[in-house]
């Protein structure tokens, strides 16, 4: 899935035109303060390009959080983003208190030349996702006629459409696939992300190592399956390693994560790895805890000793880190999706931190290192390594689906060239 046959912003004539742009400003917030502005910064080049090339206006639309179609301005307003964007762009940003309807259409119909306008959270309307919840929390579906009206209103806000929301590219939501304008182009962030993944998956440097962490095997089955056709080596770490170790080594895992569904296909995955000549590295030792808690009592365990009843593994141990480091040293290209321990808690962060240090070291010797968004991107922010690896993806779910070999609806909807 690349952008090679799709219209991109650098080929779009924006002079004198109103540009309506879907961005991903779904940033982490604490008490209405933005805690990581990576996604806002990432959209700036596309916005600046439009302004520098004489666009009449740039109307920005995004979601934030999961309000499920209910307006929650106190919790999920994009207003703080307008303030942040103003300081990043060095110019005024007009914030509108809705994203569709007559007042919004009027404000966007004939704005002053060079205006930047940010709409309120798209997901305050159930028509964006097509489903949500009502005020009492019951599931609701959007009516088709109302979805049409919502999409028609968004389409009135610009003359051309740009999608730079890679983080939402795997969602067939109204703002991603339903804006009906003659020209629909991918923005620079979308282009950068897709080019990186296309190169990594279609013509990788070898040896190619995938590092897969996270909790559930079942969630990552398609990922493991698809990557086994592409890589030379694979590290399987994090919570899902316990399902592998229990099935393959009959290891005692205590109350560690065990995935019943995933367990059924562990042997199939391992035989595919063998058939494809992929070297698999699993953890051999662990930092354990007597409960899932930041301040739990901690212990050590190995695959041979097993994890005692009532205890769980929350990080890999030093021997595993050594094995992981050896795999990283052999690689010329690395794709990393999912942490190898509960990195949010100091006591269980060492394994992921040690691995990050090795990946940074590998990058400095010329290895291509790609971090699939989500938790692994958060690790980069936490340890300040975002500019010490080749590419940190802004999209967790979107990068996951690309690595699984899927077509992204948001990219599919762009104009062909």
Curated annotation (Swiss-Prot):
Changing residue 252 to A: In PGK1D; with chronic hemolytic anemia; variant Antwerp. CDP binds at residues 214, 219, 238, 338, 340, 343. Mainly expressed in spermatogonia. Localized on the principle piece in the sperm (at protein level). Expression significantly decreased in the testis of elderly men. Its EC number is 2.7.11.1, 2.7.2.3. CDD domains: Phosphoglycerate_kinase. Phosphorylated at Ser-203 by MAPK1/ERK2 under hypoxic conditions, which promotes its mitochondrial targeting. The modification N-acetylserine is found at residue 2. The modification N6-acetyllysine is found at residues 11, 48, 75, 86, 91, 97, 131, 146, 199, 267, 291, 361. Mg(2+) binds at residues 215, 218-219, 375. The keyword Cytoplasm applies. Changing residue 378 to P: Loss of activity. GO terms for molecular function: ADP binding; ATP binding; metal ion binding; phosphoglycerate kinase activity; protein serine kinase activity; protein serine/threonine kinase activity; protein-disulfide reductase [NAD(P)H] activity; transmembrane transporter binding. ADP binds at residues 214, 238, 343. Gene3D superfamilies: Phosphoglycerate kinase, N-terminal domain. It is found in: Cytoplasm, Cytosol; Mitochondrion matrix. The modification Phosphoserine is found at residues 2, 4, 203. One of its GO terms (cellular component) is mitochondrial matrix. Pfam families: PGK (PF00162). Its cofactor is Mg(2+). Its main location: cytoplasm. Belongs to the phosphoglycerate kinase family. HAMAP family: Phosphoglyc_kinase. It is linked to Phosphoglycerate kinase 1 deficiency: A condition with a highly variable clinical phenotype that includes hemolytic anemia, rhabdomyolysis, myopathy and neurologic involvement. Patients can express one or more of these manifestations, and some affected individuals develop parkinsonian symptoms. PANTHER family: PHOSPHOGLYCERATE KINASE, PHOSPHOGLYCERATE KINASE 1. This is Phosphoglycerate kinase 1.
């Amino acid at each position: 899935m690349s952008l090679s046959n799709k219209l991109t912003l650098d080929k779009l004539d924006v002079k004198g035109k109103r540009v309506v742009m879907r961005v991903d400003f779904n940033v982490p917030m604490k008490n209405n303060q933005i805690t990581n502005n990576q996604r806002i910064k990432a959209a700036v080049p596309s916005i600046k390009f439009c302004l520098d090339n004489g666009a009449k206006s740039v109307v920005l639309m995004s979601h934030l959080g999961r309000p499920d179609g209910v307006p929650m301005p106190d919790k999920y307003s994009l207003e703080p983003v307008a303030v942040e964007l103003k300081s990043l762009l060095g110019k005024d940003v007009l914030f509108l208190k809705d994203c569709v309807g007559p007042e919004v259409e009027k404000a966007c119909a004939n704005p002053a030349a060079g205006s930047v306008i940010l709409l309120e959270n798209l997901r305050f309307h159930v028509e964006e996702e097509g489903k949500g919840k009502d005020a009492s929390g019951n599931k609701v579906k959007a009516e088709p006629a109302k979805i049409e009206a919502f999409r028609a209103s968004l389409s009135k806000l610009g003359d051309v459409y740009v999608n730079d929301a890679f983080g939402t590219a795997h969602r067939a939501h109204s703002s991603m696939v339903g804006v009906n304008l003659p020209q629909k182009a991918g923005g620079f962030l979308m282009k950068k992300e897709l080019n990186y993944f296309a190169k990594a998956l279609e013509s990788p440097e070898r040896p190619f190592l995938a590092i897969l962490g996270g909790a559930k095997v079942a969630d990552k089955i398609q990922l493991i399956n698809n990557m086994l056709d592409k890589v030379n080596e694979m590290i399987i770490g994090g919570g899902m390693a316990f399902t592998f170790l229990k099935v393959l080594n009959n290891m005692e895992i205590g109350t560690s994560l065990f995935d019943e569904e995933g367990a059924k296909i562990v042997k199939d995955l391992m035989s595919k790895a063998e058939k494809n000549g992929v070297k698999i590295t699993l953890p051999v030792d662990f930092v354990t805890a007597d409960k899932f808690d930041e301040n739990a009592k901690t212990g050590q365990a190995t695959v041979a000793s097993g994890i005692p009843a009532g205890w769980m593994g929350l990080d890999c141990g030093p021997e595993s880190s050594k094995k992981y480091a050896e795999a990283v040293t052999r690689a010329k290209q690395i794709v990393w999706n999912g942490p190898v321990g509960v990195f949010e808690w100091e006591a269980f962060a060492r394994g992921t931190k040690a691995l990050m240090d090795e990946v940074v070291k590998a990058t400095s010797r010329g290895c291509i290192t790609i971090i699939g968004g989500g938790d692994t991107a958060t690790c980069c922010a936490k340890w300040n390594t975002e500019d010490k690896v080749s590419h940190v993806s802004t999209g967790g779910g979107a990068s996951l689906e690309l690595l699984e070999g899927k077509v992204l609806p948001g990219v599919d909807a762009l104009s062909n060239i």
